[in-house]
Amino acid sequence: MVKSHIGGWILLLFVATWSDVGLCKKRPKPGGWNTGGGSRYPGQGSPGGNRYPPQGGGGWGQPHGGGWGQPHGGGWGQPHGGGWGQPHGGGGWGQGGGSHGQWGKPNKPKTNMKHVAGAAAAGAVVGGLGGYMLGSAMSRPLIHFGNDYEDRYYRENMYRYPDQVYYRPVDQYSNQNNFVRDCVNITVKQHTVTTTTKGENFTETDMKIMERVVEQMCVTQYQKESEAYYQRGASAILFSPPPVILLISLLILLIVG
């Protein structure tokens, strides 16, 4: 009788734990940053020592005059010049103000900003960047560059450097170095293009410092994504059919015995 109760409680605990792990897999993992050594990537022969020379035009996947996923010059889901359900120009239904003021035109749905922010925090795929994801915002790392001038320059200009990195899933790379190299290249290039479009330019010192900063952030992103990837793999192995069937069989034998 005692064995029966013990077996029942063990089975109940196992089922509850299994369900909780399944739910936890859907929760986003927290981010962070760490500090480390210098850049491991030599220059690529760009003029002036910069690997990423300023380029004209807009950034990859970036709309004209707005942020990521933002319409041209306007807010999310906001009509031009009027509120929802109102025709353009302030006229009444069926009156002037263009074809949008006629009956039969459905209202445009509003975008839920909480969903947009949640997707970005979890590493949303960026359109136009070929499968790259945008990581969560990080605090810029505290780095010493070996001389007072660059240390002071970084402290005074750190706001000019990115606080998010672009990356692909870790399972597409054979090691950390390849992940970090690709992450640094696309992040620095995208940030340089976007900033140059706004009329700002980067000096050789800016490029050197930015590469070091982005490198540390990419290392942090790799560690975060690797931990999440291995946790998903471990959960898949633990709760794969053979171990589950074996455990349930042992519990049944314990209860029957």
From Swiss-Prot:
Binding locations of Cu(2+) 2: 72-74
SUPFAM superfamilies: Prion-like
Lipid anchor positions (GPI-anchor amidated alanine): 234
Glycosylation sites recorded in the entry for this protein: 185, 201
Disordered: annotated span: 28-110
Binding locations of Cu(2+) 3: 80-82
Xref: Pfam families: Prion, Prion_bPrPp, Prion_octapep
Family under the similarity heading: Belongs to the prion family.
Entry domain remark: The normal, monomeric form has a mainly alpha-helical structure. The disease-associated, protease-resistant form forms amyloid fibrils containing a cross-beta spine, formed by a steric zipper of superposed beta-strands. Disease mutations may favor intermolecular contacts via short beta strands, and may thereby trigger oligomerization.
Protein name in UniProt: Major prion protein
Species this chain originates from: Vulpes lagopus
